[in-house]
A protein has these predicted regions:
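C-terminal amphipathic alpha-helical interaction region
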Residues: 91, 459, 475-584
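Extended, charge-enriched "interface" segments that sit outside catalytic cores
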Residues: 1-81, 85
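Internal helix-loop-helix
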Residues: 59-60, 89-167, 210-212, 346, ...
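A short core secondary-structure module
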Residues: 199-245
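C-terminal helix-coil-helix/basic helical segment that borders enzyme active sites and/or dimer interfaces
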Residues: 343-399, 506-520, 539, 543
Length: 584
């Protein structure tokens, strides 16, 4: 039988990264749970064995339940009955299978019924879910919203809500509205305090809410009368059991048909405050969105994987002019580029996940110590600060680049299929439709470049690249100077030359002292930094496992070099005077 984990050694490879041992020891608090729970690991090897078992189970469920259901779910989709959303029939089968497999509350502590797995392991499961069915991944992965409640809610809220998610109840994040999409500070859903009932009441409309009829909602609402900016917004928890929210309509979408996208009407719905007032957008949603963006990077990687799988299988099978089409340079070129982009994006995904793991776990440890009058050591505080900055810098790059690559790979996947790819009988058309949203929701690629912008202009990505050239890792202190195998030293030297051009382009843009010009060319600088970082990551991967990454490291390095030339040429030949040609 197929298995999306055991059939894909590239996923397992990222669980062997040297930093994973440190992450695991932090997450397990040096295995303190072994005396409290009989299923808690006793040591590193025991924990890795546990991860392996769960990942194999997840790979089996995704390959043999969720993936075979994908076409039926896409065809049926959800529907409305009496202002309630009803999933496609096979979606319930998928949910039941993931609940029975224990694939909920993956990152939550054991004391709430969670698995207490780090983000790198959650990310591996998430990628496999997306490989099986992109739309179902939306429903399953929204359990990640519980991270925000766990982090910012109080202990009573944790005890009431976290176990429910660990048991398989669903979540949603209700942020956007008809007049507040990317511009979330314009949210106007009204929250008023009900003194008699000692609760908050929510009134208004939310639009484009993924899985909007979920069991537990995190809701961004305006709690401060008379405000119109982000400082008047707070985060609330709405429990579907309380009633007061109707699903007015389901969006009729191009893709991800199995994932219900809802318009919600809040009618004096009872809710409770999560965290402090006024911090809903400026603190809590920013944390929520960073987690969601990393989730989309995993979703995008899963889509790229399935697009490549389908294209490769077809190219081997389809014969023209007396031979399989994979033997034609025009076809194997496309397939090699697809694979290189897939591998580069995946390496970036897991690098980002490692950064998120370290700082998030250290923040959790800090909360635990603070509760007993203790604190992090100076070394731990410095590590938390370093990895938090890296996570903040890498997340918009991971989300943006993997989602763009998913779109490119599904496009090329159809091209490999030729005319057959345009027919509904082949899965490649569904993947193409599903991929289109990936570079739009949870922040468009254009917004990801904005989020990354300060790390471009202040030289941070340049420092990251310099560290990676030195030891293969950022920060340089977690790597080693012999990181690059001799065979790949020429690729490393090409990256060094790319870095020179990147730094020159950044210096040129900064010297213009023109914000509009900077915004105009920032996408080019963003992709230059991403291309170099991903090429260096793949060189490191190939140095450790040439049997898995040799070809992709070489192909991507050539691809990155050509992309650097293209972006460099555009930036260095442009000026603020040129903007008049583009404005309308």
């Amino acid at each position: 039988m197929a298995n999306f984990y055991t059939d894909n050694p590239n996923i397992k490879f990222y669980l062997t990264h040297p930093l994973v041992k440190h992450i695991l020891e932090l997450k397990e608090r040096n295995f303190a749970d072994k005396d409290k729970y009989d299923y808690a690991p006793e040591n590193f090897e025991d924990a890795m064995d546990n991860y392996e078992r769960v990942l194999e189970l997840a790979g089996d469920v995704m390959a043999n339940v969720v993936a075979p259901n994908a076409e039926a779910v896409d065809a049926e989709g959800p529907h409305l009955e009496n202002n309630r959303m009803i999933y496609a029939s096979k979606t319930y089968e998928n949910l039941d299978a993931t609940i029975k497999a224990g694939l909920n509350g993956v990152t939550m502590p054991r004391r709430y019924g969670g698995l207490n797995f780090p983000m790198v392991v959650y990310g591996a499961i998430n990628e496999m879910v997306a490989t099986a069915d992109t739309g179902f991944e939306n429903i399953w992965s929204l359990q990640d919203c519980i991270e925000t409640l766990y982090e910012f809610g109080n202990e009573d809220q944790r005890q009431r809500y976290v176990p429910r998610v660990c048991e398989g109840q669903t979540m949603s994040m209700d942020l956007t509205e008809p007049d507040a999409g990317s511009d979330l500070q314009s949210v106007m859903l009204k929250a008023t305090y009900d003194e008699k009932e000692d609760c908050w009441r929510l009134n208004g409309c939310k639009r484009f809410i993924t899985n909007g009829d979920s069991d537990i909602h995190l809701v961004l609402a305006r709690s401060e009368e008379g405000t119109r900016d982000g400082r008047g917004l707070s985060m609330f928890i709405y429990d579907k059991n309380q009633g007061g929210v109707d699903v007015r309509r389901l969006e009729n979408k191009l893709g991800i048909h199995g994932s219900p996208t809802c318009e919600l009407v809040y009618k004096n719905a009872k809710a409770e405050l999560c965290g402090d007032r006024k911090l809903g957008l400026i603190k809590y949603v920013m944390g929520l969105m960073n987690g969601a963006r990393l989730g989309i990077a995993g979703q995008s990687t899963g889509v790229s994987q399935m697009a490549y799988n389908e294209a490769l299988a077809y190219a081997k099978e389809r014969k023209q002019f007396g031979k399989a089409i994979i033997e034609f340079p025009a076809v194997y070129d496309m397939l090699a580029i697809m694979k290189a982009k897939l591998d580069a994006g995946r390496s970036l995904l897991y690098a980002t996940s490692r950064y998120v793991d370290v700082y998030k776990i250290l923040e959790d440890i800090e909360r635990e110590r603070k509760a007993v009058g203790d604190k992090l050591t100076p070394e731990e505080r410095n590590e938390c600060k370093t990895f938090s900055k890296l996570a903040d810098a890498f997340t918009p790059v991971a989300k943006g680049m993997t989602s763009e690559y998913a779109n490119q790979n599904t496009y090329d996947g159809i091209q490999v299929h030729g005319g057959s790819g345009f027919m509904l009988e082949y899965a490649c058309q569904r993947l193409y439709r599903d991929a289109r949203i990936l570079s739009i929701y949870e922040g468009t690629t254009q917004l990801q470049t904005v989020a990354a912008g300060r790390y471009i202009t202040n030289g941070f990505y340049g420092t990251v690249i310099a560290d990676m050239l030195q030891t293969g890792q950022a920060p340089a202190s977690v790597g080693t100077e012999d990181w690059c195998a001799a065979e790949y030293l020429p690729l490393k030297e090409k990256c060094a030359k790319m870095a020179e051009k990147y730094n020159e382009a950044v210096a040129y843009v900064n010297a213009q002292k023109n914000d509009e010009f900077k915004d105009f060319v920032i996408r080019h600088l963003y992709e230059m930094a991403a291309d170099i970082i991903m090429s260096l990551l793949l060189i490191g991967d190939a140095s450790r496992a040439p049997e898995l990454f040799n070809e992709s490291a070489k192909v991507y390095n050539r691809y990155a070099a050509s992309e650097i030339e293209r972006h460099y040429s555009f930036v260095m030949s442009a000026s603020a005077d040129d903007l008049a040609d583009y404005r309308k």
